[in-house]
């Protein structure tokens, strides 16, 4: 791909830097407006290496070298670092971290919406240790609230916004041990509808956890693995519909029904587009499955009608899944789609009254390197072969994961396989069935009112405090 022809001229770089300097100087007038609206974009597993790779991919999808491009999040004026550790884990999981950036307190791994006094899977440590989230603070302040995710709506990230649960895996009562049910613990799907009964917009996957056991799925009638899971016989979707129909509530399960809604006539929306997680963006059926950008657009159109403003949590949740599976291509394309959603939200909001924050819960053992030349195809090979085993290697590698593979006792020669395939497993140094999270700090990008409060190296649980202060909600009313 080479590089733009003006780059050898010092003037090009000096002019660019001076323009950037002008922008930086304009930031000396801080935006101290009150934030009417709050949007948090959470890229699950979107560490800095993932952000950089997504930037390059975004440019290359447009036929450019990629490195010089800008993601939407790159344009945000304020950037901080977030320390992601959980109270009991150096390398964090998505549940304890979600409790931090949504509820404002650090917590143990595997737990959502409870303090560190609660112990994972120990039902009797729930009561008295519940902590509320910024979603609740916003609702209490009269704002509309929404959750949009590409995972199950009762997955770790969204669940910390409304649930108090000592185990992130208690998706429905089917996944709970008997002692937890007897102790009166509620599964996460139930809590979605009962704890904050009037969440205005809920979109994502997770249909099967809402229906009685063996209820056939509407989209996959011939596949028992997608059938309902609930042992208590409740149909949570029907209960929601019965409760909300007269309040301009609509339930949808496919893209056509979603996009045929008139958002000015919808007050409550429940969209469950898959039995579990939504498909990867690269594998999405563009006729039946909405993209993250499409869901975000509908959500904002509904939420912004509230004169008191709104809080919206948007999760690009499958960046994380791609990395765990060692499928670098899926992960990075997911990150690019989340960036598109950030751009869509930008077109629909104003920095004068909307604070937008983009961050990750944790990183991954994902890296790219190998002295690749400018414009090197991001999923391509490094420019030279190994001087140890005389074989080529891809620029992208994982520290551990399912991509560890030996052929005749030696590292696989990647030139003999299709490393451009969507489901190719990038090579990993240590064999694991699932690649792990990374422990380093993650970036926090912020723009809008009081965005300058996100400015240095912070504990992750500081994020909702800064956002709440900007909107004068929660402890900062």
From Swiss-Prot:
Subcellular location: Cell membrane
EC numbers for this chain: 3.1.3.1
Any GO CC annotation of this UniProt entry: plasma membrane
Active site: 94 (phosphoserine intermediate)
Entry keyword set: Cell membrane, Disulfide bond, Glycoprotein, GPI-anchor, Hydrolase, Lipoprotein, Magnesium, Membrane, Metal-binding, Phosphoprotein, Zinc
Binding site for Mg(2+): 44, 155, 157, 315
Glycosylation sites recorded in the entry for this protein: 124, 214, 413
Binding site for Zn(2+) 2: 44, 361-362
Binding site for Zn(2+) 1: 320, 324, 437
Family, similarity comment: Belongs to the alkaline phosphatase family.
PANTHER family, sorted: ALKALINE PHOSPHATASE
Protein name according to UniProt: Alkaline phosphatase
Lineage of source species: Eukaryota, Metazoa, Chordata, Craniata, Vertebrata
């Amino acid at each position: 791909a080479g590089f733009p022809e003006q780059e050898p001229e010092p003037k090009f770089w000096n002019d660019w830097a001076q323009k950037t300097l002008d922008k930086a100087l304009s930031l000396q007038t801080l935006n101290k407006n009150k934030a009417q609206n709050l949007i948090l974009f959470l890229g699950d597993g979107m560490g800095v290496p993932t952000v950089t790779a997504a930037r390059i991919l975004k440019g290359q999808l447009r036929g450019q070298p990629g490195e010089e491009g800008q993601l939407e999040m790159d344009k945000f004026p304020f950037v901080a670092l977030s320390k992601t550790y959980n109270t009991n884990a150096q390398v964090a999981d998505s549940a304890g971290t979600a409790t931090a950036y949504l509820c404002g307190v650090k917590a143990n791994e595997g737990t959502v919406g409870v303090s560190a006094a609660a112990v994972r899977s120990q039902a009797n440590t729930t009561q008295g240790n519940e902590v509320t989230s910024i979603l609740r603070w916003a609702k209490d302040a009269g704002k509309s609230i929404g959750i949009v995710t590409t995972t199950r709506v009762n997955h770790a990230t969204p669940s910390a916004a409304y649930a108090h649960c000592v185990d992130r895996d208690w998706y429905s009562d089917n996944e709970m041990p008997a002692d937890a049910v007897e102790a009166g613990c509620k599964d996460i799907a139930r809590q979605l509808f009962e704890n904050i009964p009037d969440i205005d917009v809920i979109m994502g996957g997770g249909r099967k956890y809402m229906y009685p056991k063996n209820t056939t799925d509407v989209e996959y009638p011939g596949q028992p693995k997608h059938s309902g899971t609930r042992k208590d016989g409740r149909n949570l979707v029907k209960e929601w519909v019965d409760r909300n129909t007269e309040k301009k509530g609509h339930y949808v399960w496919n893209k056509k029904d979603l996009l045929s809604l008139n958002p000015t006539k919808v007050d409550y929306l429940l969209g469950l587009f898959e039995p579990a997680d939504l498909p990867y963006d690269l594998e999405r059926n563009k006729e039946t499955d909405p993209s993250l950008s499409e869901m975000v657009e509908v959500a904002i159109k509904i939420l912004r009608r509230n004169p008191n403003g709104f809080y919206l949590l948007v999760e690009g949740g499958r960046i994380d899944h791609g990395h765990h599976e060692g499928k670098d291509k899926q992960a990075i394309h997911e990150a690019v789609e989340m960036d598109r959603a950030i751009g869509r939200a930008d077109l629909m909001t104003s920095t004068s009254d909307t604070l937008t924050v983009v961050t990750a819960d944790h990183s991954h053992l994902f890296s790219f390197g190998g002295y690749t030349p400018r414009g090197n195809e991001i999923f391509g090979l490094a420019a030279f072969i190994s001087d140890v085993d005389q074989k080529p290697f891809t620029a992208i590698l994982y520290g551990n994961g399912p991509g560890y593979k030996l052929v005749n006792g030696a590292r696989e020669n990647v030139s003999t396989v299709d490393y451009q395939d969507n489901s190719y497993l990038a090579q990993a140094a240590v064999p694991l069935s699932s690649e792990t999270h990374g422990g380093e700090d993650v970036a926090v990008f912020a723009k809008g009112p009081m965005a300058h409060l996100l400015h240095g190296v912070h504990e992750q649980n500081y994020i909702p405090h800064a956002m709440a202060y900007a909107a004068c909600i929660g402890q900062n009313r």
